[in-house]
Each structure stands twice: as C-alpha cells, then as structure tokens.
C-alpha cells in the first residue's frame, strides 16, 4: 500500500492511473449499522439511521470500483464483532478481496513508519499535495502547511452531524468534486473523520486519475500540533501482531509483512 501511495515522481505524475484508500473504523461501522457514536472528536450520534450512514452504505455498494484496475479502490476493514457479523460486512462491499486490507494499517505499532511515509510524501510531492483537514487548524499552522501543499480544503469537525443538512451536504461534496476536477495525477490526503470515506467516493467518481488516501488521525500531530489519540504517544499500545510495516532506509521503500 505504501509503495502504491508513494510511487516515484515520473511514474506518479505522468501515468493515467490513480488510487483510492478508505478505512472503515469504529465510527464508520456504527454509522453504517445505526449504532450510537461518541467520538473523540467533537461530535456524536444518538443512534438510528443517519444520512451519512446511508451514504457510506451506498458507496460500499458501488460496483464500478471492481472494474477499474487502472485506479484501484482499496478498503481498510476489520472484524467488528460487537457491531455486525464479519460476513455481513464483506457482503456489503462490492469489491474484489484482493483490494481489502487492514483499517489500522497506518496506526498503532505502524505509526512510526507512517510518519516516515508522511515525510517521504512531503519531500517527493512538495506543492503537489491537496490536504483535506478540519477547520480547527490554527492560522499559523495553516501557513506552515501551505509551504508544501498546493491547496488546503477545510471541513468542520462536526461534519457527520452537519451531513444531515441538505445544503451542507451539497456544498461539502461540491467542494471536493471541484478540486478533483481541477487536478490530475495529484495526491489528496484526507483527515476529516467519517466524511473522508464518502468524499473520497465522490472525488474518485469525478476523476479517478488522482490518489485519494484516508490517513485519518495520523495527520493530527502535523496539522493540529497536538496529540489526539493514545497511539500517537505510545505506538505499541494497541499492537496488532497480524501485520507490520517496516521502512528500508537504504532502498527507501516500505515492506509489509505478516507475523504470527
């Protein structure tokens, strides 16, 4: 996955190919199945069907994803036993199993390698990155981020609640669709919670020739200058022994391996 995200400059900027990666975590799964949500971020959901949950389900059911090998659409998933049977989740996803990976691919014990990936992307794709983050980022931090991005799109941190509003939903989709339309062979980095999953869907539909990556909270220390999740200060806190990312400093590549 890391090698797909961080392809060499001549390849990534000249080929008519793209990539999308969305992650289905606890919050997304609960919205999908109408379960109440109490987020670490400043929003919650009392339970029952939400418009965002409905749109998440619609995106999962989109059959066109599986027929676009030139712009593969990857899902990060996990076995959410307390929310739904795993086979039920898999039956909702209209995608070939080879495009399914781990929702926690970038966090926990892999977070140190993810930070190296961030550094690599900023260095290799400077001023060719579109950053999609929450609007709580300070003006001083936005100035710093502007040094290596070509555009920053801001969304409210209570977006999942605002998604119930037709006008907000239309404007939110329109903003990302407009950006996807204006760029080609660029890197879009998303960190706006559950909205990322639906907005990546709309961006990919408009223009599959970009890379749309849901990095989630792994970007928080960089964009907010503070720790928002326990794993950011203790990467071993929730060690998942089923997979591991390692960064080869000599070859400057990432390797994903499975361990028992």
Features from the language model and the residues they span:
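Residue-level detector of flexible, active-site-proximal loop/helix-junction positions
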Residues: 82, 157-159, 219
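Structural motif
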Residues: 129, 186-187
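Electropositive, gly/pro-rich neighborhoods at or near active sites that engage anionic ligands
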Residues: 1-147
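Glycine-rich beta-strand-to-loop/alpha-helix junction loops that act as flexible
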Residues: 190-193
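Hydrophobic residues at beta-strand termini and immediately following loops
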Residues: 22, 153-156, 215
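A mid-sequence, solvent-exposed acidic-amphipathic segment
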Residues: 148-186
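Short, catalytically relevant binding-site loops at active-site mouths
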Residues: 137-139, 157-160, 195-196
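C-terminal functional extensions of proteins
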Residues: 195-260
């Amino acid at each position: 996955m890391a090698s797909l995200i961080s392809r060499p400059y001549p390849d990534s900027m000249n080929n008519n190919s793209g990539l999308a990666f969305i992650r289905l975590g606890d919050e997304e799964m609960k919205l999908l199945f109408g379960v109440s949500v109490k987020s670490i971020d400043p929003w919650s959901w009392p339970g029952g069907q939400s418009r965002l949950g409905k749109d998440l389900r619609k995106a999962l059911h989109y059959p066109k994803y599986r027929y676009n090998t030139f712009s593969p659409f990857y899902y990060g998933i996990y076995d959410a036993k307390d929310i739904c049977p795993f086979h039920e989740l898999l039956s909702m996803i209209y995608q070939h199993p080879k495009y399914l990976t781990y929702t926690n691919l970038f966090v926990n014990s892999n977070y140190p390698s993810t930070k190296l990936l961030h550094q690599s992307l900023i260095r290799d794709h400077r001023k060719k990155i579109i950053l999609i983050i929450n609007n709580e980022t300070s003006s001083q931090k936005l100035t710093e981020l502007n040094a290596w991005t070509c555009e920053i799109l801001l969304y409210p941190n209570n977006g999942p609640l605002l998604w119930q509003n037709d006008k907000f939903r239309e404007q939110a989709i329109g903003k990302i669709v407009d950006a996807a339309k204006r760029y080609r062979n660029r890197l879009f980095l998303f960190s706006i919670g559950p909205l990322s999953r639906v907005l990546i869907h709309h961006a990919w539909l408009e223009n599959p020739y970009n890379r749309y990556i849901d990095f989630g909270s792994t970007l928080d220390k960089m964009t907010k200058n503070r720790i928002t999740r326990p794993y950011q200060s203790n990467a071993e806190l929730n060690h998942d022994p089923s997979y591991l990312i390692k960064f080869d400093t000599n070859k400057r590549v990432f390797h994903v391996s499975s361990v028992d």
